Amino acid sequence: MRFFVFLFLIVGCWCDVQILIDETGRYNITVNNQVWLRSSRMAIYADDQWYSTENTSLPLANITTAEGKDSTLGSWNETRLTYLLIRKQKTTPIVARIRQWSTVSALTFYLETGDLELTTNVTLHVDDVRTVFPSFLIEKMDQNDRRGYFTVAGQFGGQDDKHAGLWNASSRVVRLGYHGGPVVLFNLTEQGEGDTLILSPLSHFMDTSLTQTTRASQSILEYGVAGSMTSVPANYMQAFIVYYSEQGVNKGAREWGQTLQRVYNRTNEYRLNDLSLNYLGYYIDNGGYYCHNTLPGTNYEDTMIEIAEQIDIPYHYMEISAWFYYKGVRGGVSNWTARPDVFPHDIPYLHRRLGNLPFIIHNRYWAYDAVYQDKYAWILDPEGGTSLPASNDSFWLDLLTEARDWGVILYQQDWLSLQSIWFRPILTEINLGERWLTSMGQAADQVGLNIHYIMAYPRHFLKALEIPRVTQARGSDDYAINLMNHTEPQWNMGITSMIIDALGIAPNKDVLWSTSVQPDSSYGENASEPLPDRAILMATLSTGPVGVGDRINYTNLERIMRCCRQDGLILKPDRAITTINALVADWADNEGVPQGELYSTQTTM
């Protein structure tokens, strides 16, 4: 059997990474001459059936090589595997490409699905995939193989279902494909300080997933278009990256993220200059004292005026949260404008009344009965009770222009997860989710607003690589959870911060209390913050917003001012606080049971 061998020469690295491709199209990735990943099948689902390399339905026609230069990542050479898809009396070449780079320690995988649309009447589950390339066996190679993994998954940047374990066939690495995110694979014998691979999508982040299947008693990691998509357009191309670092989990994650930022030419300008990331703010969201809890006998207009006059900290903006707009079917937003019982004189009046104090403002998923459908192109989902603008740039431009005129500097897009899974067309129509977020981001850029993602799946903040106006994303659950249940460590965002920060986005811990007990809140009579210093510390070192949500006369000024200058400028580190490599390794080595919390960050003086 013949092998095609390609060798990475990684500058300053004592080890090498190889990709070996045999004459059947199978490939192995080795680290230090040890096999780390072996390929499985390549497959396409169309016409309600699978075409696969496992049988003769997707035969390999030829293997060729090519080389070239990318303006961003430099020189490359690649192997091209051409398969023949025979359907509807037509033969379509399907090209799978494996590219290696001369100056970047990564392998990139591309699948070109051919010049015919891939249609089907019977769709697969959303957590499955309908195009498969690449795919890797999840296996322990021998008795000396001690590798672990972790991954982020679920809401809040993957905080909800982040998990870790040993890399073997019995591990459930991907639990729900659509909810999942990057997979970090590392050497446990080095306590996470050495060889590391990061596996993640490289394109079409809203439409593609990693999934895990079992075939012939083998556990397999597969990447491709989400199984619920009804069709894949002609000439579609998906991309995937396997990034290698010899410098451990944290450094490897940062290098991976920096590489993706280079691919998408993401600028750091908006994050660096975001007022809400640089200065203290006052928050009234779920965990803030005044969330759904105005001063007695008043509305939010009066309450916010009183807060502005009485809260004695150098805050530079205030938050307007989910209590200000009209809600409709299934709790979605029906009309994103101020209710008169909340703001009798409307938001522009309040902005002027507070001396033109900037606002950050909340939004959620769109209700089925949203009032905009008569004026703009709008898609309805009666089954999910939700709706969405049909990637109509004029809608987002009108909406965010109005917000800017209210005094808004940051738009918070919350409930991203439910807008994605409750709105069926995003799961069935390829590119719709991409267009939704792109249109929002382009409009924000036109009017000069930044965006904060909340309740995001990993796919959302990966998509934000293409949307530089997304400057921040929540990496933890709502702070109210912490106030009501001290056994739920809402503050422990060291894993999600690692991934979010690597992508050029500031992780957000959510609002905080600076005093432990603040009576008569909406969170129950036993609500409290057991460790206010910890809450302030984690918010500060996250590099995200530091948002105070205290009751009037309950702010501990001494505590708050430890995190900032007298003018409210936050004294933040150079990178977000993250879990140290050794604790990540212990987490995996103990099959996903956390062994404590220990964090690190750094600052250049």
Show which residues each predicted segment covers.
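Carbohydrate-recognition beta-sandwich/jelly-roll modules
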Residues: 16-318, 335-341
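Glycan-recognition surfaces
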Residues: 369-406, 438-556, 577-593, 602
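Mature catalytic domains of secreted/periplasmic carbohydrate-active enzymes
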Residues: 215-221, 331, 418-427, 434, ...
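Glycine-rich, histidine-containing beta strand-loop boundary motifs that form or position
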Residues: 111, 124-128, 284, 322, ...
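Cleavable N-terminal signal peptides of Sec/SRP-targeted secreted and luminal proteins
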Residues: 1-15
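Alpha-helix-loop-beta-strand connector modules within alpha/beta enzyme cores
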Residues: 345-355, 431-451
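Non-catalytic C-terminal accessory modules of carbohydrate-active enzymes
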Residues: 56, 60-70, 553-605
